[in-house]
C-alpha cells in the first residue's frame, strides 16, 4: 500500500520489522501543530492524503476499496486509532496509526505528511506519538513500504525497524535485492550504513501466509 509519499522510483516491496522500539528517537511536535484523532466527517480527506494533489478517480476507487476491505468491518476501531496531525487552521497535514491484522500481527499503517510540510520533523513526531504507549504485548510491529520512501525508511530505522530479508512475506514477493540497490543509490551513505536486516522464521510468517494477511 502507498504508506508514505513516494519519490519517482520503482514500487517494489520492502517489509520491515521492529521488536524493540528505540525511544531515543522520539520527538515532540512544535506548537505550530497538534495531534488528534480522525473525525468521521473527514474520511474523504484522509483517503486523499497519500496522493497530495494527484487524487485521481482511479486513486479514489483504490482507497474506497482498500478502506472497505481493511477497515470497514472495524470502523469504530479505525476512528479510535487513526492519529492525524493538524496545523493551526485545523487542516489535516499528516496521518499514521497502528493496526492489528491478527492477535500477533501488529502493523504500522499509512504514514504520510503532506509534501509542503515535509522536512519539518513532523513525521518523526507523528511516529513518536503512535509508538509512545506501545507495550511489549504489542510487539513486534510490521510495515510495508517501497524504495521510493527512502526518507521514511531512514526514520523507521531510527525507531528500531529492520528490513526483513526473507524472499517472501505471505503471498507477496520481498524485492529485497532490487530495493537495497535503489536505497544505496538514493540514500546518503551515512544513513544507508545504519540499515539493519533480519531474517524471520516461525510463527509470524506462518500466520501471515496461512491467514492471507496482506493489508499492510
Regions found by a protein language model. Give the residues of each.
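Acyl-donor-binding surface of acyltransferase catalytic domains
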Residues: 1-31
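Conserved acetyl-CoA-binding loop of GNAT-fold acetyltransferases
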Residues: 7, 131, 157-166
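Short amphipathic alpha-helix that is part of the acyltransferase structural core
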Residues: 26-62, 86, 182, 186-189, ...
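A conserved beta-strand-loop-helix scaffold within acyl/acetyltransferase catalytic domains
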Residues: 51-114
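Active-site proximal loops enriched in glycine and acidic residues that flank catalytic Cys/His/Asp
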Residues: 110-112, 130, 145-147, 165-168
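Conserved acetyl-CoA-binding loop-helix of GNAT-fold acetyltransferases
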Residues: 113, 119-134, 154-158
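Conserved GNAT acetyl-CoA-binding A-motif
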Residues: 134-145
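Conserved beta-strand-loop-alpha-helix junction that forms the acyl-donor binding cleft
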Residues: 143-153, 169-181
Amino acid at each position: 500500500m502507498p504508506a508514505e509519499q513516494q519519490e519517482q522510483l520503482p514500487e517494489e516491496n520492502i517489509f520491515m520489522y521492529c521488536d524493540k522500539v528505540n525511544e531515543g528517537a522520539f520527538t515532540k511536535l512544535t506548537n505550530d501543530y497538534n495531534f488528534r484523532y480522525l473525525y468521521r466527517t473527514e474520511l474523504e480527506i484522509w483517503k486523499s492524503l497519500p496522493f497530495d494533489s494527484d487524487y485521481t478517480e482511479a486513486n479514489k476507487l483504490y482507497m474506497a476499496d482498500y478502506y472497505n476491505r481493511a477497515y470497514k468491518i472495524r470502523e469504530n476501531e479505525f476512528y479510535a486509532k487513526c492519529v492525524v496531525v493538524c496545523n493551526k487552521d485545523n487542516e489535516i497535514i499528516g496521518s499514521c496509526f497502528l493496526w492489528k491484522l491478527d492477535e500477533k500481527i501488529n502493523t504500522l499503517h499509512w504514514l504520510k505528511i503532506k509534501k509542503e510540510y515535509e522536512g519539518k520533523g513532523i513525521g518523526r513526531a507523528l511516529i513518536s506519538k503512535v509508538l509512545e504507549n506501545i507495550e511489549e504485548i504489542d510487539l513486534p510491529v510490521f510495515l510495508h513500504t517501497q524504495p521510493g520512501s527512502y526518507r521514511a525508511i531512514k526514520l523507521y530505522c531510527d525507531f528500531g525497524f529492520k528490513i526483513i530479508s526473507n524472499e517472501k512475506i505471505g503471498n507477496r514477493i520481498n524485492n529485497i535485492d532490487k530495493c537495497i540497490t535503489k536505497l544505496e543509490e538514493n540514500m546518503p551513505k551515512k544513513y544507508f550504513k545504519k540499515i539493519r536486516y533480519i531474517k524471520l522464521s516461525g510463527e509470524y510468517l506462518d500466520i501471515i501466509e496461512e491467514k492471507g494477511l496482506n493489508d499492510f
